[in-house]
A protein has these predicted regions:
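Phosphate-binding loop of NTP-binding sites
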Residues: 4-164, 168-177
Length: 178
């Protein structure tokens, strides 16, 4: 995404334009941040457990509750939960932390699989699956499949906590080895 100097000037003059520029930069920074975060995640293996909170609704509250329960720093749980923000949140987890809690959201198809490969969670919490993503995903089934990518990467020694009250989440029990 390239802008002429006059486009930049006009975008910088409005809050919406500044937000648009910032999001564009976050998206473009993803390749760099994701490589750094991937190396960092490998360094965390063995002494820091990573918890990923996914779902259409309730991620922020759930992530903060999980962090508080585990004694993790709730100030490092970011509600900004896509693209570079996921990588930055992973980079914020310190090697001496026993747990890191990440809120992971998506804006479109294919993203959750990328995040799952990057985050390599030890525990996944799936809150709910709803129609919030219909602007970027075709239907509820595509949303379910996309969100399930995070539980599909779990090994047998990992844990998936699924909302059994939501049939759109409960079916994921068959999608994981955990």
């Amino acid at each position: 995404m390239r802008y002429s100097p006059s486009d930049l000037f006009h975008l910088l003059r409005t809050p919406v334009g500044r937000s648009q520029l910032k999001e564009g930069l976050q998206h473009r920074a993803w390749p760099v941040y994701s490589r750094l975060a991937g190396r960092h995640r490998r360094a965390l293996r063995g002494h820091t457990r990573i918890v990923a909170v996914v779902g259409s609704y309730g991620k922020s509250t759930t992530a903060r509750t999980v962090a508080c329960t585990l004694g993790a720093d709730t100030n490092r749980v970011s509600a900004r939960n896509s693209w570079s923000h996921v990588a930055k949140a992973l980079l914020a987890v310190r090697p001496q932390d026993p747990y890191g809690v990440l809120e992971v959201g998506i804006d479109g198809p294919g993203q959750m699989a990328e995040y799952a490969r990057l985050v390599q969670p030890d525990l996944v919490v799936v809150t709910s699956i709803g129609t919030e993503h219909h602007r970027s995903l075709i239907d509820l089934e595509q949303t379910q499949s996309e969100k399930a990518e995070m539980v599909r990467v779990l090994d047998a020694n990992c844990l998936a906590i699924l909302n059994g009250d939501d049939p759109n989440v409960a079916w994921m029990a068959d999608q994981t080895r955990a």
